[in-house]
Amino acid sequence: MYLSDNFKKHSKYPSTNAVHVYAVIAMCLGLKNFNLNDSQIIDDVNNGFETRRKFFRRLLRCIDMLPNAYQVAQKWNISDHDKRVKDGSLTYDYFNVSEGKIEYCILKCVYIEMFEQYGIRSLCKIFCMTDTTSYENLPKHVRFIRHSDLSDGSCCHDEVIDKRRIRE
């Protein structure tokens, strides 16, 4: 996998870690050989990264104690958007930032492309779920709405809402 032309092509995006993504793809393909279904594979891979995610969750919970936690999340989103547009790893239909809300729709994603080339597009949900994991750990300040993602839909449409500013 790491010697393939596709790996070389995907390594050109600095905002993605192709080595890490390809390792996850290899794990998924290996688990597929045991006739596991997608949800079992996703659970197994996520369980393998549990220690790393626990640290990340703790950090997010600390951030959620800050009065400006939404602004921190907003800066992450804007920074991530700018990096990914610059390197071409994501193609946005739109990315709107307004007072207390970010809404975007992603039409093309290099992560999806990497998984799709191995016939396991649906397993890219492992990476799509990182947003959900992030925002569910900011419950005091952020409401995250995922309308769709690219692992099983035609776009990734998300809303990140400041709970203190917008009442729904």
Question: Where in this protein do the model-derived segments appear?
Answer:
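Short, hydrophobic/π-rich interface segment
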Residues: 91-145, 149-151
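Terminal "cap-and-tail" regions of soluble proteins that handle hydrophobic small molecules
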Residues: 18-21, 166-168
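Short, charged/polar, Gly/Pro-enriched secondary-structure boundary elements
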Residues: 111-114, 164-168
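Short, charged/polar micro-motifs that form catalytic or ligand-binding hotspots
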Residues: 9-17, 121-125
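C-terminal edge-of-domain segments
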Residues: 154-163
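N-terminal leader/targeting and assembly helices and adjacent pre-domain segments
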Residues: 1-14, 23, 27
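Amphipathic interaction/junction segments at domain boundaries or subunit interfaces
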Residues: 19-25, 29-118
